Amino acid sequence: MPEERKLVTILFADVTGSTELGESLDPEDVRALMGRYYAHAQRVIQEHGGALEKFIGDAVMAVFGLPRAHGNDAERALAAALALREAIATDPLLGGRLLLRMGVNTGEVVATSDQASGDFLVTGDAVNV
C-alpha cells in the first residue's frame, strides 16, 4: 500500500504497575503473564476487526480502519477495549494481577504497509493518545 492519509481509530492498552510486578516475580513468571496478556490482546483486537500494529514493552497498539474502513471503527475499538479489560479480569492467572490503562482516539494518520510483513505503520497526531 502506498503512503496515504486515512481516518482511523487507535487503541492503546498499557499494563499499570509492570515495574513493581517485574520486581516481585521471577522473570519467567513475568514473561508467562505478559504472554497471556499479549495473546488476549491479539485475539480481542482481531475479533473486533482491528489490526495489531505493535507491542511496545507492556503496551499494545492497535489500529481500526486499516486496511479497510468499516464505518464503525470507533465503536469496534471501544468494544475491543472493554472486551480486553473483561478478558484480563476473568483470566484465572491474570485477574487482579494485571491492571490496564487504555486510550482510544480517532483521527487522521499517514498509513503505510510494510511490504515484507504486511503490517501497517501509522503516523500522526491520532497516535499520540
Question: What residues fall within each predicted segment?
Answer:
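Hydrophobic alpha-helical membrane-association signature
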Residues: 30-37, 77-80, 84, 125-129
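Conserved long alpha-helical elements within nucleotide-processing catalytic cores of c-di-GMP signaling
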Residues: 19-42, 53-54
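Catalytic core of nucleotidyl cyclases, primarily class III adenylyl/guanylyl cyclases
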Residues: 7, 12-16, 44-76, 87-127
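Intrinsically disordered or compositionally simple regulatory linkers and C-terminal tails
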Residues: 1-7
